[in-house]
């Protein structure tokens, strides 16, 4: 084991010379998790092998309820740098990861072209890392716990409902927003995971796959780079679409698997490590498929207006009395009668009058004539402020701490401008990550573009209907939805669209779905 000399200031580790406290080197043993750099917070304890990079429990800790959580150390990333060792193969999508052993401060990292991942800012402070559930949550005597071979909780009464949780005095209901109090059943400082944290693990997984040269420290590695990503329960038969050798144990509901049960039954190639973000037993399981998971930190306030007319012209002009839209606004059209070619797409608009606007690049001359109605929806998107602590979010839509609604958004969030595919012919709602060799993630170290990468949102030119193998052909469902609640990862029947990057912007806080659950995280 490496030299473990440490210097503490009170309970805070201020100096160490042990590389195991860092994120590690992509493609090698132990990458993607690490050792907590200080005295463990109350309730946490080491497991057998926590300090040993060769152990299946490396970087894994147990909370007092029995939950197994992985420590994810702070890291910096660089996208598409010509100086990258991976640039020759991956070009604008080459990913480099560096820890605080390489750059002691964010300023030093930024100067070298590396960005601090947004997941490591919470409550107005940069964090040394975060604890993240190794497994999807299951019901552990009324507590949402991260346990191997549990029956994953869902937001619906028919399938291990979160409403059955009672721990820590919480009242939990079977809606997506119920995942916020569900996480609190483990303790007040826990939170339903954020999309920032999820995207950080997705980025680590992709970087690990790019750097790996064999399956030795990356069990899901594919030298052909076609299925070079974590495997998941996705083929609607308790197996992985990308590798049918990997099998999950049924939890008794449809084809949902028990938490962390990849490798069930044994056999050649059927190993748990193929289901983790780092391809090792110490990694986080089931980010690809099995259950969609609620991921906090982003929402939308949207309103719809009814179409009064649409022209067969180039460009197509829409009539809505007093529409209030401005040049460059992005809108979604659904349910138009007659001119159905407009439906289920996003558009950039140009204002032509108080009651009219055109759809940029849309020639509707050959479309069927508009007959009646249709909705145009415009939304304002928001992201958690750096000053906001994830544990502070509440589940309503009217209070100052609520994740949804104008009051909570004003207090807890900042404006965000997502990139959407609005080019005519490529502007459908169903998108996937990747578009030929185009850059998918922004490389900026600050600003709106940096936030998009922190959330794992693709560039407009970085998505397409077909996607790319580098990003697992993962699903990106672009949508404009009031009270948006993000869900990530996909479900047991989503096949290739499920994956570590998979994200849907379709869902709202009051949905209740048997294939949507949660896991927890905590900043300390």
Q: How would you name each of these model-derived features?
A:
Residues 1-17, 369:
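Short, low-complexity N-terminal tether/leader segments at secretion or assembly junctions of large
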Residues 65-66, 92, 97-287, 392, ...:
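Short aromatic-cysteine micro-motif
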Residues 281-282, 320-323, 510:
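Short, conserved secondary-structure segments in the cores of folded domains
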Residues 85-103, 358-374:
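Short solvent-exposed strand/turn elements
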């Amino acid at each position: 084991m490496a030299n473990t000399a440490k210097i503490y200031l009170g309970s805070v580790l201020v100096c160490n010379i042990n590389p195991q406290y860092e994120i590690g080197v992509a493609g090698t043993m132990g990458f993607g998790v690490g050792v907590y750099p200080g005295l463990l917070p109350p309730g946490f304890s080491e497991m057998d092998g926590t300090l040993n990079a060769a152990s299946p429990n490396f970087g894994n800790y147990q909370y007092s309820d029995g939950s197994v959580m992985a420590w994810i150390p702070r890291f910096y990333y660089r996208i598409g740098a010509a100086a990258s060792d991976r640039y020759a193969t991956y070009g604008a999508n080459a990913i480099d990861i560096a820890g605080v052993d390489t750059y002691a401060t964010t300023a030093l990292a930024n100067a070298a072209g590396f960005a601090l991942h947004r997941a490591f800012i919470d409550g107005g402070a940069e964090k040394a890392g975060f604890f993240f559930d190794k497994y999807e949550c299951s019901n552990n005597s009324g507590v949402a716990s991260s346990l191997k071979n549990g029956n994953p909780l869902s937001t619906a009464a028919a399938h291990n409902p979160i409403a059955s949780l009672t721990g820590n005095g919480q009242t939990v209901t079977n809606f997506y927003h119920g995942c916020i109090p569900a996480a609190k059943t483990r303790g007040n400082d826990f939170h339903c995971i954020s999309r920032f944290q999820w995207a950080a693990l997705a980025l680590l997984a992709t970087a690990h796959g790019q750097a790996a040269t064999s399956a030795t420290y990356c069990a899901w590695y594919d030298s052909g780079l076609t299925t070079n990503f974590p495997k998941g329960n996705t083929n609607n038969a308790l197996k992985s679409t990308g590798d049918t050798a990997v099998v999950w144990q049924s939890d008794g509901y449809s084809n949902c698997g028990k938490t962390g049960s990849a490798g069930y039954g044994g056999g050649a190639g059927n190993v748990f490590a193929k289901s983790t973000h780092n391809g090792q037993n110490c990694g986080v399981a089931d980010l690809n498929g099995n259950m969609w998971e609620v991921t906090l930190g982003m929402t939308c306030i949207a309103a719809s207006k009814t179409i009064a007319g649409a022209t067969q012209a180039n460009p197509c002009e829409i009539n809505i009395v007093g529409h209030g839209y401005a040049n460059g606004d992005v809108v979604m059209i659904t349910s138009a009668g007659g001119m159905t070619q407009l439906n289920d797409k996003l558009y950039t608009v140009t204002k032509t009058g108080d009651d009219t606007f055109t759809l940029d690049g849309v020639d509707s001359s050959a479309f069927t004539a508009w007959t009646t109605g249709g909705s145009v929806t415009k939304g304002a998107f928001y992201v958690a402020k750096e000053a906001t602590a994830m544990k502070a979010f509440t589940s309503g839509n009217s209070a100052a701490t609520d994740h949804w609604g104008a009051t909570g958004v004003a207090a807890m969030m900042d404006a965000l401008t997502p990139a959407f595919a609005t080019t005519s012919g490529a502007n459908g709602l169903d998108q996937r990550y990747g578009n030929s060799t185009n850059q998918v993630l922004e490389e900026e170290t600050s600003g709106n573009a940096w936030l998009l990468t922190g959330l794992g949102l693709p560039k407009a030119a970085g998505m397409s209907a077909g996607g790319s193998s580098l990003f697992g052909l993962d699903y990106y469902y672009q949508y404009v939805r009031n009270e948006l609640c993000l869900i990530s990862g996909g479900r047991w029947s989503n096949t290739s669209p499920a994956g570590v990057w998979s994200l849907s912007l379709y869902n709202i806080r009051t949905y209740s779905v048997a294939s949507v659950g949660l896991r927890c995280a905590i900043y300390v």
